[in-house]
């Protein structure tokens, strides 16, 4: 289970992440060449895709959700649920070091932004209104994720 602080989420430092995985650093130009306009806007400029528009919103296949920018594993289908918010929602990341948490005071609100711990890509936000399993709702832009389906032999 994810450890919580007295506010909402325990903050992680970049140094916590580098012990377990290599941080991906690219120039702005390299990101622009790699990503589509929408991917760049959401992942590198902290944009948001329109609600109910994401390609992964209704995905029910078993597998792993990875970062669009660096392919780091971020979420498991086991933790995905329909929150009704218009974006893919998860009750936890794939592991404790997969995402970074940052205070976000934009748009006159206080929220907690989530980013890929490996490449600092904007993913979305985490809220304290999730299911009973963790109490957290990781609200993630579809465009910031790549889905890797697990093939079953049925």
UniProtKB/Swiss-Prot annotation:
Root EC class: oxidoreductase
Enzyme Commission number: 1.8.4.12
Cofactor note text: Binds 1 zinc ion per subunit. The zinc ion is important for the structural integrity of the protein.
Catalytic residues as annotated in Swiss-Prot or TrEMBL: 139 (nucleophile)
Transmembrane segments: none
GO biological process, one term: response to oxidative stress
Cofactors: Zn(2+)
Residues annotated as binding Zn(2+): 67, 70, 116, 119
GO molecular function, one term: zinc ion binding
Domain MsrB: 28-150
Keywords: Metal-binding, Oxidoreductase, Zinc
InterPro entries listed in its UniProt record: Met_Sox_Rdtase_MsrB, Met_Sox_Rdtase_MsrB_dom, Mss4-like_sf
A cellular component term, taken from the record's GO annotations: cytoplasm
Residues forming coiled coils: none
Disulfide bridge positions per record: none
Catalytic activity: L-methionyl-[protein] + [thioredoxin]-disulfide + H2O = L-methionyl-(R)-S-oxide-[protein] + [thioredoxin]-dithiol
Protein family per UniProt: Belongs to the MsrB Met sulfoxide reductase family.
Xref: PANTHER family: METHIONINE SULFOXIDE REDUCTASE, METHIONINE-R-SULFOXIDE REDUCTASE B1
Record-linked HAMAP family: MsrB
Name of this protein: Peptide methionine sulfoxide reductase MsrB
Source organism per UniProt: Vibrio vulnificus (strain YJ016)
Gene name as annotated: msrB
């Amino acid at each position: 289970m994810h450890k919580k602080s007295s506010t909402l989420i325990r903050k992680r430092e970049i140094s916590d992440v580098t012990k377990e995985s290599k941080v991906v650093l690219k120039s702005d130009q390299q990101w622009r060449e790699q990503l589509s306009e929408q991917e760049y806007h959401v992942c590198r400029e902290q944009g948001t895709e329109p609600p109910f528009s994401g390609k992964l919103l209704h995905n029910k296949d078993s597998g792993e959700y990875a970062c669009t920018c660096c392919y780091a594993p971020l979420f498991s289908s086991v933790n995905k649920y329909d929150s009704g918010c218009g974006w893919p929602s998860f009750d936890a990341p794939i592991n404790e070091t997969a995402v970074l948490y940052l205070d976000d005071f934009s748009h006159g609100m206080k929220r907690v932004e989530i980013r890929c711990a490996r490449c600092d890509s904007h993913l979305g936000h985490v809220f304290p209104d999730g299911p009973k399993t963790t109490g957290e709702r990781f609200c993630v832009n579809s465009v910031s994720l790549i889905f890797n389906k697990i093939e079953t032999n049925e």
